[in-house]
Amino acid sequence: MPKWTPDQQTAIDDRGGALLVSAAAGSGKTAVLTERVLRRLTDEKDPVDIDRLLLVTFTNAAAAEMRERIGAALGAAVAANPRDTRLRRQLFLVHRAKITTVHALCLSLAREQAAVLGIAPDFRLMDENEGKLLRAEVLEEVLDTAYEQADEKFFALCDLLTAGRDDQKLGEVILGTYEKIQAHPDPRAFLEDVRAGLYTCGMDTPHGRVLREQARSAAQHGAAFLHMAVDELTGIDELADNYLPALTSDLNQAERLLDALFGGSWDDCVKAARSISFDRLKAARKFEDKAFLEQIKAMREEWKGVANNIREKWLTVTAEEAEYDRGLTAPALFALIDMVNAFDDAFTAAKRARNAADFNDLEHFAVRLLYTDGKPSALAKTMSEQFTEIAVDEYQDTNAVQDAIFRALSRDETNLFMVGDVKQSIYGFRLADPSIFLEKYRSFGEVADTADGQPRRVVLGQNFRSRAAVLDACNYLFAAVMGETVGDLVYTDKEALHLGADYYPESGNARYKTEVLLVDADGLGEDDDAPDKTELEARLAAKRIRALLDEGFPVTDKQTGKLRPVTPGDIVILLRSPRNKAPTYIAELERIGITASAEQRGGLLETAEVGTMVSLLSVIDNPRQDVDLIGVMRSPLFGFTEQELADIRLVDRRISYYDALLQSRTDFPKVETFLQRLDFLRTFACDQPVYRLLWEIYDQTGALGLYGALPNGAQRQSNLLTFFER
């Protein structure tokens, strides 16, 4: 049986109500969650059937892993207690356990309650490409209608965003606004709150507070550099008359600005920012340490850049000037809200006409079903009684819609078990809102200090995965960069990673340290034979790995717990874009005799070049498949631009894209060339096997040469040849 830490034991055993577990990287959170489930199933006083638990994970893969872990744990328990009928029953029920993603949960709920929602229960989910195309078509129709019915507010919006040019920016803003508000439980209500806020002025508004906070953070950053510069100059008599007066003046101005930002009115802040001036540094020709002078100048330049940014970006206008600007921009913003609502209506209608929905719809379907007038509905109360506990993993990556769903199903959080780590929130681009996790973290009390029934928190801060050298480096970095204004969390000892692994016999050995290897990519030039940045980084990484292997760098064997020389299989290279960069790293490693492989998520069919071939084969079979057809035309094989594709679509939006091509072939020579090649391939396919058709495609389009000329061309060519061989 594992030896649990006190905090892990609390997370496993606590039954006092809502519990938030802040689980640092490598803290054993999955093992803790699995053990908590097992303990609930086998509790002698209050056992729970597994189908009375709802376990929500972030991905399908995580849900499958959780089901497998729980099944394995139950299997081991049954093996140890073969006569325990209750355990055997739970093992039998594992396949019925509600271990799911939030979208799968919402999909199931929407299908069951389709009649209430007024939709068909057999609706389908659109994929990302179909959704993107449909949004573009709907947006175009909405803009056409808006131009036909334009009023002064709409023209004000156009003037603000288009400057008399094309309306691409207008469309981008409408779509961007629409997509962002989908993270709110009631997007329409949110927009109406924004509309109401436009009738008020003054900088004591959410927008004004954000501007002040941004300026405050920047001013603190710049002032810190001035403090360092003044400290460095103190005691150097040769520079007392040259540099110190100007820097002291800078520092005084920075502190006056900070005083205003922390305690003054808005106009006080603007006045302080506008009054900032920069005295000249007197030449110090006799001072010999020129590098030191450059360092001081760089610190001052940092402050000057910050001060200029504050004046130009955040503290740009007084309250009176802001009121004047509001009068000019409010009509445009009213029009933007109206346009977003119009797009929402049209997009919803288009999806319904196709009996389709997207992932945002699933979440909002659930909110509609689970809430009535802002309170949990009768359905929500009925469903909440089905679950003894709801456990949600990766809670830092939830948004407001998902949080509302979990609250409705958990009797307003009274039986909600949440696990996450705000430091690992990486899905802001998907509208995740880590502030939800932070608000709970700050408002929930420590378990030891909070009565049962009240929301509580426990921190799993010990890392059982890494050496002290790794953790110390991480803590050093994050303590420096994280704060209330960056990361929304002050990185104290409570949030830091603490050593939990006691199985490294080499712990404390000075040779185990964190290294930072820097590549100077400046001056690479434009020579075709010159290595690019990725190649240089790969070469340096390969060189360092070669050195580790040659010296027999000692590592701990996972099986024996003893030291042995490192092997290539012990080493992993983490890349932000492995699909594009991994081939370069593999080539550099193999060049110096190190065997390497890369795990390409999604496999061969997910690569851009092979995916294009699959789409082209599909189009040859049936050209009236808009998504595949447009994807092929945009690919390097045919090189149509987005503007060209849009012009073709404008021929007639009511027909398929292929039919639009047929109608426009005489007007666009590029379309005629494309259709001739497609017609040839369709004819060729009638009496030839697929492998010959594929090679004909390679030959007709020059695919191997085209993709070979792109970055990582050799790997792309290899992918195409592998696809052909299969």
Located regions from the model:
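Conserved ATP-driven helicase/translocase motor core recognized via long
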Residues: 52, 168-357, 453-455, 539-540, ...
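Conserved motor-region signature of P-loop NTPase helicases/translocases
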Residues: 1-56, 60-68, 72, 129, ...
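Accessory alpha-helical DNA-binding modules that contact the DNA backbone or grooves
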Residues: 651-681
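Core structural elements
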Residues: 94-107, 161-185, 336-341, 357-370, ...
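Conserved helicase/translocase P-loop NTPase motor core
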Residues: 100-106, 335-389, 402, 538-561, ...
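Conserved ATP-dependent motor core of P-loop NTPases, especially the RecA-like helicase ATPase domain
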Residues: 16-18, 50, 54-61, 71-268, ...
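N-terminal accessory segments
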Residues: 1-27, 31-38, 45, 260-376, ...
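Amphipathic alpha-helical segments in well-ordered regions
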Residues: 36, 105, 109, 113, ...
